Amino acid sequence: TGNYVVDRFLGLASFNPLYFNDGTPNPETCLPICRPDQLAEVKEANDIAGYVTETASKETGLAVGTPVIVGTDDSGAEAISTGVVAPGKMMIQFGSSIYMILGTKELVDDERLWREEFIVPGLCDISAGTNAAGSLTKWYRNTIFPDALELEQNGGPDAYITMMQDLDKIPVGSDGLITLPYFAGERTPINDPLARGILFGLTLAHTRQHMYRSALESVAYSVNQQLKIMLEHDVPIDQIFAVGGGCLLYTSPS
């Protein structure tokens, strides 16, 4: 289209604090980063962003003048697809990171979490995220369980299935082994890109299965921490939709 456009949800959530709540650029917060006129124009997700240009038509085969809607980001779209279209509906997205979106009637004031007007008209949301989830399990696969990966590559079972073996024989708490999952900084509630992962309580009795279970537990504790903060605001959570590759894990770590 030749137009630089972002939907309100993504603009206010991912580019905070560069925009005011009405979608106009904030000159003060833009100052150290860019000029306000360099920011994308904020529109609603179902607005028309523009129309297919001649150049785009030649590259894509789409007819010149075809309207193109603004759309939204992957997590917002997936939340709607799962059913987050009313207050009390919540999505937990299990991918490289974990992202949670809870529909609410009103905006919640809590600096620990993200909150904005949602894509669905008249609906607000609280959102939160854990930076290392699937990326943490992948790190364990590649670094701590390379034999499981090699077995898979030679026609054996999926490496993650091999890694889950015997985890259910380890008690909750991984025999005192605790992980902080901040291997890639952390989003909410600490919002600190410099946070780092920690594994403490190691003894000679611990195995790599203990380490992996502790990592899975740490992600579960992180999700629980976010949920507890949300519930501090007396917002209902009536239904939770779980999506993403993390749903394929067949052993619960807690």
Task: Name these PLM-found stretches.
Residues T53-S57, R141, F145, F200, ...:
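Amphipathic, well-packed alpha-helical segments that form the structural scaffold of globular domains
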Residues N46-E59, K105-R115, I190-L199, L248-S252:
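Acidic-glycine-rich active-site phosphate/pyrophosphate-binding loop
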Residues A56-T66, E116-G122, L202-R208:
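Glycine/charged-rich beta-loop-alpha catalytic/anionic-binding loops adjacent to active sites
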Residues T1-G2, N26-D37, S57-K58, G103-T188:
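A short helix-loop
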Residues G76-K138, N142-T143, D147, E232-S252:
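Catalytic phosphate/nucleotide-handling subdomain of diverse soluble enzymes
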Residues G176-S252:
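Activation-segment/catalytic-loop signature of the eukaryotic protein kinase fold
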Residues T1-D73, P181-A184, Y212, L216:
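Gly/Ser/Thr-rich active-site cleft segment
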Residues P36-A45, P67-V70, M91-F94, E152-P157, ...:
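Beta-strand segments within the central parallel beta-sheet cores of soluble alpha/beta enzyme folds
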